[in-house]
UniProtKB/Swiss-Prot annotation:
GO cellular component, one term: chloroplast thylakoid membrane
Localization annotation: Plastid, Chloroplast thylakoid membrane
Catalysis performed (reactions): a plastoquinone + NADH + (n+1) H(+)(in) = a plastoquinol + NAD(+) + n H(+)(out); a plastoquinone + NADPH + (n+1) H(+)(in) = a plastoquinol + NADP(+) + n H(+)(out)
Membrane protein topology class: Peripheral membrane protein
Protein name (database record): NAD(P)H-quinone oxidoreductase subunit J, chloroplastic
Keyword DNA-binding assigned: no
Keyword vocabulary terms for this entry: Chloroplast, Membrane, NAD, NADP, Plastid, Plastoquinone, Quinone, Thylakoid, Translocase, Transport
Pfam families xrefs: Complex1_30kDa
Gene name tied to this protein: ndhJ
Similarity comment text for this entry: Belongs to the complex I 30 kDa subunit family.
Species whose genome carries this gene: Oenothera argillicola (Appalachian evening primrose)
Gene Ontology terms, MF aspect: NADH dehydrogenase (ubiquinone) activity; quinone binding
GO terms classed as biological process: photosynthesis, light reaction
Function, as annotated: NDH shuttles electrons from NAD(P)H:plastoquinone, via FMN and iron-sulfur (Fe-S) centers, to quinones in the photosynthetic chain and possibly in a chloroplast respiratory chain. The immediate electron acceptor for the enzyme in this species is believed to be plastoquinone. Couples the redox reaction to proton translocation, and thus conserves the redox energy in a proton gradient.
Amino acid sequence: MQGRLSAWLVKHGLVHRSLGFDYQGIETLQIKPEEWHSIAVILYVYGYNYLRSQCAYDVAPGGLLASVYHLTRIEYGVDQAEEVCIKVFAPRNNPRIPSVFWVWKSADFQERESYDMLGIRYDNHPRLKRILMPESWIGWPLRKDYIAPNFYEIQDAH
């Protein structure tokens, strides 16, 4: 079933894939990494000016990594907000997705956390570096194929 935003994107010739609706009735779309930045700008201009959250997850061991964006459009009031969920998948051997920091500033720390935990590189992010783990940490702790070290010493811990 195609939602309202998906129909609008089709009408304007914008490449995407409808993934239906989640359990709360929120339309979910899949966007290719190479299309994501331009579609993000279009969605912002269309009225999705609030990035509610961004997260990422490992789809399956050895499989794809996903970056998920929950966008909100408030046109007629807070009680009538329109939401959409965007999923952008990337291969685990070179997970690169365009950053939307320059579209929604609130993506800053959220994209950094996704980089820190899963190793997704957000191209053109101004400060893409670890935010939770020490800079010396090896690997991406939330990947399903991550092997935790037996011992890790944090220098200068008090």
